[in-house]
Structure formats: C-alpha cells, structure tokens
C-alpha cells in the first residue's frame, strides 16, 4: 500500500476532516476549514498537549493572550526589523518566489548536496548560486529574475477608524511574545518560582509566500507553545529534558520511531537569539517536515522587552539571594501540522480475506474524533440503542448510525478512526449486553450494558 497525500486529502475532504476555505466562492488560496470530524481531532490533540504540558506538569501554568499587541512588542522581538523572506520576481511571467526555496527545490530535483541549510546564506550568495546554476522560473522556465528583496511576513492592519501610522497594529506571527510580556504578571499571581513554564494555544499569522502541502504550511495557523524559564547555566539540562518530553508525547499518541527524527540545527541555521535548536520532524508522504522546534532562546526575549519597555524583567531568587534574567527553553509545536501528522500516521489500507481492502485510521483512542459508534442491528432496536448512546455520550463523543447493513457501518467507522463500535442486537433486549468491536483487531466481545462505562474508562487514557 502506497500512502500518498492525494489519498489522505481525498479522505479528509470526503469524510469531514478538512474542507477548502470559502469553497462556494471559489475558495481562498491555502485556507482550510476543519469539518465535523476535523475539529474533534484537532481539539483532542490540543487537549492531549494541554494535559501533559500544563495540567499534569508540576512546573507549568497556562495563559491565553491577545492576538493584537502594542506594536512596540514587535520592535522588541525583532519581528518588525528582521522577520522577512528573501524574494525575487521573474521578469518574464511576474511570478514571485522565495530565493531559498528555489535553491532547495533545485537541489532536491538534481540530487545536489548544498552542504547544509540555505538559511544562513546571504542574499548575494543566493543570487550568485541561482545565476551560476542557471536555475529557471518554475512557472515559465526562463532565467530572468530581479534582485533579491526582503519581504516582511507580518500581516498589518489598523486599529480604530483612521488608517494612519499611529493606529497600525499587526496580527501576531507567534504566540510566544504574549507570554514574554506577561512573564512578571504570571510569576507574581501564580507564585511560581524559577524554573517554571507558561503554556499557550492560539492562532498566529504569517504572510508566507510559498505555503502548501495541505494544512502543513498555511498563513493562518495554530500554535501550542511553552516558554520555560530557568536559571542561566541550567538551560542545557532543561533543553535536554523538554526535547525528550516532546518525543515521548508523540510516541505515547502513536507516532512510530521510524516516522520521526530529531534534527539539530547547524551553527549557520541557528536564529541569532538561539544557543541551540532541535527540530522534531515527521516523515510525511511529501517528505520530512518540521513539527516541533525546541530552542534555547537564552535571555534574549526578556532582555529585549526590558530594554524597549523600560520595565524590569528580572527575577529575584529569594533562596540564593540573587537577581537574574531567566533563560528560556521553547518547545513550539504547530497544532495543524501535528494534527496532519497524526492523520498521515493513522492512515492505512489493509488487505482482507477474499481480496477486500479496508481503509482504516488507526488513531490513538485519546485523539480519535469519534470514540464509540453505536450501531443498532435493526431500526426496530433503536429505542434500546439510543439509551446506550444517551448514557455514553455524557462521557465520550459517540456517533449513532442505523443506516445500511452492519458490515458497511463498521467500514464507515473504520474509515473515520472510531476505536470501538457497539452493536445493539436482538439478544440485547434479553441479556442486557452488547457486542463491542475493536477497530484494529476487528475482534468482538460481549459486555454488559451496565459495565460499559467502566469498560471504556481505561481505553482512552494515554
């Protein structure tokens, strides 16, 4: 079975995981809406992250910060001055491209070893390489580009009724800065001592020039970020801790060893503020792609906000009787990307006896969008089956389905990743029991209706 993005995207659209955005108006490039199953899957992924990184962690608390922030925030963070992509236009067809992507795509197509990432190259190095290798426009095939220019990735808008400079605001390009500006507030009100972390889930926006690969890279996306504050000198220890914690979280939810890798950034790839960065990447059908960036940001962010705002961002350690600006370890995860990774990892086509093929999503039960399918064997049994549904739906997202033969209903539930199906049959009226079918093994067992809640309690933990 070849696992392709075409198959996964087709299933996602057909079954209600993801729809093209604004579809009745012809769509809007690279926008996607999560459907009835997609929203459940993504919400379950976010709940699983919050559970392990905030709720169960003795170190961390959460916040939910505003998308619009004082523009000085982006001066301090460096986004207004340095958050940009190197762009060049084709003079023949007037298409615009990222210079670094042109080089990387050409290298992939020609099996050329670049000796590392293009991220650290200067504009001059990129332009010279494109000219030397005679890299052509992907749209028209000509080699006639403008010089490279830097294009800021932030979405700019205006607050209030007049569109002038003093009312300019930006849609946040990351959730992290809301955490940094609230560092002192959270530390004071939560009474947390360093080391501690602040987690946040929220939307961010980047005016990417080359988005693509379904929901992997979009201009509007959701992040699950933790900023972990620690004493300088302990940062590498905590970097190692959170790196492994992130890997363990992915494994616990079903990502396999051979589907992911941890890639350390080379010195030329590192952001100017980073002492070290590791990307946890997933092997999508289109190739390796970053899920999680784990960075040692040192004291850069709090120092910058202290300088620009004039507010003291230091922390006083009352046990050691010393004052310092904490270092920050940041594990930053894309909610849309990791949701797509779980979808790709779960997708399978199984050959059954007789040559039949079963399409199934092997989601971990904790993130499956529908936990239990309730299937009466006949519509005459709906009343009893509906009582089972009414009870279990208090605790789990269930789906009631009484249309079609039972075999086809099982296949439908397999295709959307439902871990368990309950069949309410004619014997159920007499013995007070139902048949529970396991999605992965397809094995069935008889369980008393009164015991169902207890039976399922352990099934959905991770």
Curated annotation (Swiss-Prot):
Its EC number is 6.1.1.14. GO terms for biological process: glycyl-tRNA aminoacylation. The keyword Protein biosynthesis applies. One of its GO terms (cellular component) is cytoplasm. Substrate binds at residues 98, 174, 221-225, 330-334. The keyword Transmembrane helix does not apply. It comes from the Bacteria. Keywords: Aminoacyl-tRNA synthetase, ATP-binding, Cytoplasm, Ligase, Nucleotide-binding, Protein biosynthesis. Catalyzes the attachment of glycine to tRNA(Gly). ATP binds at residues 206-208, 216-221, 290-291, 334-337. This is Glycine--tRNA ligase. Homodimer. One of its GO terms (molecular function) is transferase activity. It is found in: Cytoplasm. It is an enzyme of class 6 (ligase). It holds the Pfam family HGTP_anticodon. PANTHER family: DNA POLYMERASE SUBUNIT GAMMA-2, MITOCHONDRIAL (PTHR10745:SF8), GLYCYL-TRNA SYNTHETASE/DNA POLYMERASE SUBUNIT GAMMA-2 (PTHR10745). Belongs to the class-II aminoacyl-tRNA synthetase family. It catalyses: tRNA(Gly) + glycine + ATP = glycyl-tRNA(Gly) + AMP + diphosphate.
């Amino acid at each position: 079975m070849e696992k392709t993005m075409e198959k996964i995207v087709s299933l996602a659209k057909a079954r209600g995981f993801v729809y093209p955005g604004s579809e009745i108006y012809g769509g809007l490039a690279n926008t996607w809406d999560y459907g009835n199953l997609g929203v459940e899957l993504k919400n379950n992924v976010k709940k699983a992250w919050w559970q392990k990184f905030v709720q169960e962690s003795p170190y961390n608390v959460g916040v939910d910060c505003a998308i619009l922030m004082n523009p000085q925030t982006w001066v301090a963070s460096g986004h207004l001055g340095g958050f940009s992509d190197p762009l060049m236009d084709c003079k023949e067809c007037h298409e615009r491209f990222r210079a670094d992507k042109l080089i990387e795509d050409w290298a992939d197509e020609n099996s050329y070893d670049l000796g590392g990432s293009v991220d650290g190259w200067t504009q001059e190095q990129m332009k010279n390489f494109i000219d030397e290798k005679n890299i052509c426009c992907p749209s028209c095939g000509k080699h006639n580009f403008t010089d490279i220019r830097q294009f800021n990735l932030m979405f700019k808008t205006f607050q209030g009724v007049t569109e002038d400079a003093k009312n300019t605001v930006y849609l946040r390009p990351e959730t992290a800065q809301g955490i940094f500006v609230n560092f002192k507030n959270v530390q004071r009100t939560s009474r947390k001592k360093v080391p501690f972390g602040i987690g946040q889930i929220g939307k961010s926006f980047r005016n990417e020039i080359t988005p693509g690969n379904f929901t992997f890279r979009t201009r509007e996306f959701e992040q699950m970020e933790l900023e972990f504050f620690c004493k300088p000198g302990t940062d590498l220890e905590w970097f190692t801790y959170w790196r492994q914690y992130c890997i363990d979280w992915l494994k616990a939810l079903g990502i396999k060893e051979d589907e992911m890798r941890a890639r350390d950034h080379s010195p030329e790839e590192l952001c100017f503020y980073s002492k070290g960065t590791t990307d946890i990447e997933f092997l999508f059908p289109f190739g390796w792609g970053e899920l999680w960036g784990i960075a040692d940001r040192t004291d850069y962010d709090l120092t910058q906000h202290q300088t620009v705002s004039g507010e003291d961002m230091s922390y006083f350690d009352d046990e050691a009787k010393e004052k310092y600006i904490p270092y920050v370890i940041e594990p930053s995860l894309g909610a849309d990307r990791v949701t797509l990774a779980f979808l790709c990892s779960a997708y399978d086509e199984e050959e059954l006896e007789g040559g039949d093929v079963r399409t199934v999503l092997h989601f971990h039960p904790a993130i499956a969008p529908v936990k239990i399918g309730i299937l009466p064997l006949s519509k005459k049994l709906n009343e009893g089956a509906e009582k089972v549904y009414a009870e279990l739906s208090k605790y789990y997202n269930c789906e009631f389905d009484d249309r079609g033969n039972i075999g086809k209903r099982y296949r439908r539930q397999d295709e959307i990743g439902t871990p368990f199906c309950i069949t309410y049959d004619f014997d159920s009226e007499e013995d007070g029991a139902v048949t529970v079918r396991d999605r992965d093994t397809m094995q069935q067992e008889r369980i008393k209706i009164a015991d169902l809640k207890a039976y399922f309690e352990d099934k959905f933990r991770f």
